[in-house]
Amino acid sequence: MPLSSPKQRETPVSVSKSSAQHDATPSPSSLTPLSAHTTPGEEVSTLKQGATRDEKEATDGGRVEGDCSWFQEQTCGLILECVADMDACFKAFDKDEDGFLNQSEFSALCRALFRNERGKPYPVETSMLNTIFTIFDTNKDHVIDKEEFRYCWQKWIKQVVRPVTALVIVDVQNDFISGSLALINCPAGHHGEEVIPPVNRILEENRFDVVVYSLDWHPENHVSFIDNVHMRSLHSSCKLMCEETQVYDTVIFDVNNDGTPMEQKLWPRHCVQNTWGAELHEDLKVAEDAILVYKGTDPDTDSYSVFWDNNKKFHTTLNEELQKRGVTDVFVCGVAYDVCVAATTKHAIEEGYRTILIDDGCRGVSEEDIAATREHTIANQGLVVHSSQVKNLATGRDRPPALAYKLALEL
C-alpha cells in the first residue's frame, strides 16, 4: 500500500458541500501531498483507489474465487479438505451422505471454520451454534439442504474466510496530539502521539480494501467550543448558567429556540477549519487509496462518529462508500478512544459491520469511559484486539466466533 507523510504544498485538497452535516469546503494543508483528486459535490473525498481484488489475491498466497484448498481443518480426528468449491465443502461435512447437513454436521463445519491463525479451534457455545443453524435453516425442517447451504456459502462462509476490510483512522489531528485539546491535559493523561507508531505499522503491514481518515473540521462558531457557550440560548432545563460553565461540562441548549433540548459537552476550541490544529499529524502515514471524511462542520451540531452526527439526524456518505465496496469488516483506531472512536465503533456495529477495535491504536480522555467502550464493543459481538492481531483477522486466517456470529445475525 503506497504511503506518504503529510507535507505542505500550494494546491490543497478540497471537498464540497453535500449535506447539512458537511457544509464547509475544507482545504487542509496536511493532506496536500497525496496524489488526490476530489469530485465537486462529494462530502467524502476519495483519493486514488486501492489494490484490485486480483492484486490482493496475488499477495495473499494466490487464493482465488472458488478455490478453497487453503481451508484445511482437523476435527474429530478427520482431516477435512475443501479442494474445489461449495459442493466439495458440503460433501466433506455431509458425513451420512444423505444430501443434507443436520445440526451436528453443521456444528462440525462451524468448529472447523472458527480457528485462529495457528489452526487452533475456538471454544464455541452450543447456543451460538444453534442460533447460526436456525438462521440458515430457512424452511425450519431441522436440516440444511443444498439450496440453503448455497445461501450460507455465498452470504456467510465466503465473508468469514475472505472478509472485505476497511481501516478507519479517527481524528489523528494536531490539536488532539499537542494542541488546544491535547489528550495529555485530559483526565486520563494519555499521550495522543502514541497511536501513530501502531497505526503506521498497521498501514505498512496490511492491504485493506479501503482506508478512511476522519477529521474534526469545525467552523469558528461551533457549538462544542466553551468560548461560544454565550452564542446560543440555554434550555430551561439546564442547571448551569453561561458564566458557570467549565471545560468538560455538559449543558443543554435550545439551539432552534423552539423548546427542543440538545445536550452538548463543552470542549476547548479545537480543529478549526483550515488551521494547523485541524491538520493530520505530520508523522501519520497517509495511504494513497484513502477516503477522507470531514465531520462536525455544522455550527449547531457536534459529530463524534465518522458515520453520523451526535443527534443521528445527518449521516456522512461513509456507509454508502463502504457498501459500494462490499466491506464486511471495519477496523477502528485513533483518538479519542472514548469519544469519537467510541461513537464510530458503536455506529459501525449498528450499521451491521463486523467491527474490530484496535486497542493499542487508540488513546482517550477518561479511563472509566475507555473501559466502557471496550465493554460495549465486546457485548455487541465486536472485538477489541492488539495491532499485532490485525493481519490475521484481515486476511481471514484468524476467524473468531464472535465476528462470524455477528455476520450471521445481520442476515
Please report, for each region that a protein language model flagged, where it lies by residue.
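Active-site acidic carboxylates
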Residues: 2-7, 13, 37, 43-97, ...
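Short, contiguous clusters of charged residues that form electrostatic/catalytic patches at enzyme active sites
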Residues: 151, 197, 313-320, 343
